[in-house]
Amino acid sequence: MTYQKVATMVASIGVPYAYYQFPVGTAQPTPFVCFYFDGSNDLYADDTNYQKIRPLTIELYTDNKDFALEATVEGILSSNGLTFARSESWIDSERMNMVVYTTDVIITS
């Protein structure tokens, strides 16, 4: 999967999205998504990286629990052949629900 394909996949969720965070001063109403690559888990040996593997995090923010939107995100990940883990928390100071999806993406040219 290319980096552009990942961005297109995130866009297909159908809510505002940004890489890592929205620009300062552009607070988004919920729901919205932030996504980012968190390091690397490349396959390498003999001083050569053979395969780029990037841990992808997708954070879904909503006012309240949104089962339908979560199902949309999970369906998009699954239809793109990505297995994922999820966690959820309530951000009391922001009065928001956050669902975090993590997966590994094999990056191609």
Predicted regions and their residues:
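Oligomerization/assembly interface segments of phage tail-like spikes and tubes
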Residues: K52-N64, N97-I107
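Small/polar-rich, solvent-exposed N-terminal microdomains that initiate assembly or binding
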Residues: M1-Y44, L69
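Short secondary-structure transition/capping segments
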Residues: P23-G25, T30, I58-T72, T108-S109
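Acidic-leaning, charged glycine-interspersed low-complexity segments
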Residues: A71-S109
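Short amphipathic alpha-helical segments, especially helix-boundary/capping motifs
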Residues: Y20, P31-C34, D46-Q51, D63, ...
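A generic structural micro-feature
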Residues: A27, T48-K52, R95-N97
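Long, continuous compositionally biased terminal/linker segments
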Residues: Y36-N41, A45-D47, L56, T103-S109
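Short, surface-exposed, polar/charged, turn-prone segments marking secondary-structure boundaries
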Residues: A45-T48, L60-K65, A85-S89
